[in-house]
Amino acid sequence: MVNTQSPKNSGLENLVNQPYKYGLPLIFEIETISKGLTEETIRLISEKKNEPQFMLEFRLQAYRKWLEMSNEPEWAHLNYPKINYQDMVYYSAPKQKKKLQSLDEVDPTLLETFEKLGIPLTEQKRLANVAVDAIFDSVSVATTFKEELAKEGVIFCPISEAVQKYPDLIKKYLGSVVSTSDNYFSCLNAAVFSDGSFCYIPKNVRCPLELSTYFRINNGESGQFERTLIVADEGSYVSYLEGCTAPQFDTNQLHAAVVELVALDNAEIKYSTVQNWYAGDENGKGGIYNFVTKRGLCAGKNSKISWTQVETGSAITWKYPSCVLLGDNSIGEFYSVALTNRYQQADTGTKMIHIGKNTRSRIISKGISAGHSQNSYRGLVKIGPKAVGARNYSQCDSLLIGDNSQANTFPHLQIKNPTAKVEHEASTSKIGEEQIFYFLQRGINAEEAISLIISGFCREVFNNLPMEFALEADKLLGLKLEGSVG
């Protein structure tokens, strides 16, 4: 075993134990509602958002279904104490005296805060060719490049704004992919979500900018329940990226989001996530519970949805970005890197549901386990009886660092059409003494060696991220691997 205390390897120890740099809560005057979840809470959230009646009914229907479910799902390979849903704040937002009409009206302190977090929103410094919607606790505080996008007919705004301005689109698509009765956490989200992003790409338009949403949980007693809805009309294309951080608290916060994607005929949606929620301290105390439902519907012929995710944060991750391949010749893709360290737990993967003819799906999953963490891949490939000529390829690779981490793979294949072709391969490997020694002999220290091995292991996934975010994701993995060889 490699001695991480030797002078040559001390850099690796430092690399692995880097402090979480987004950990300080930001000080603002905050508007909240009382803890607890009742029908009155739902009505109060809807009232604060000034919502039409159909949205209140949508929420109440979800809340009543959630009450009927009574228990969280227990099949995931996860261990955590029971969540007290009555000891949580369901609405938290920076106080604002009036509705904001432009970035110029946003509190300068708030803008400065996002800049410190690496998300500049001001005109002079904002990210080139990337439109950003910044979500702070329960509300959107700023959206960039809205006017430029509007010239192309692209709608990109907070979902609360879309409810007011585009009710017909919301009625048609909200809940069409993830219903109000889908699962325990999606029901909770549908009942209490207060913001998120809405995007509509009109027919035959290729969105001229990358779209991005940045999520920040700042209140230690509140959960975050954002909802994202993206609709790509016929012949359109959009690339969307989300990122997230949270302060360090000794207690756990709940993040229960829902993402719905709809791709019509010949449309393509590329959805990328770099998730860096606070993962807890070195003893496993604190951190975010990341219980998320993400699903895309390839509703039209020749449509395509690609999920790419880099998961490095949160104490517990429970998410399965999925594709329902309804349209003939539609394509679903899933590229994932899930890194766990210390006492993190992840149960993540995907579902590919083949319904239409000649549908294709591709799954590339890379799991990296270090410290005392456990990392599970769970995948479902389902070929329906009418999915003539369906094709799937799945590759699930796990990499272990150290002697105390775990990696698990739970593939599930349901094939009901004899013309289908399904391939599945999996591997588990470990970074060993010989590999590190090989690098050391060539003048490369252990810190760089680990980074190079990890980078090569994840390259196929990083290649599917927008270039500037692929570079950041590569750095992020290096920073997260603290004390991982011993």
Swiss-Prot record:
Keywords: Cyanelle, Plastid
GO cellular component, one term: cyanelle
GO biological process: iron-sulfur cluster assembly
Residue pairs linked by disulfide bridges in the UniProt entry: none
Protein origin, superkingdom: Eukaryota
Subcellular location, record wording: Plastid, Cyanelle
Predominant place of localization: plastid
Segments crossing the lipid bilayer: none
Keyword Glycosyltransferase set for record: no
Similarity comment: Belongs to the iron-sulfur cluster assembly SufBD family.
Protein name from the UniProt record: Iron-sulfur cluster assembly SufBD family protein ycf24
Species this protein is from: Cyanophora paradoxa
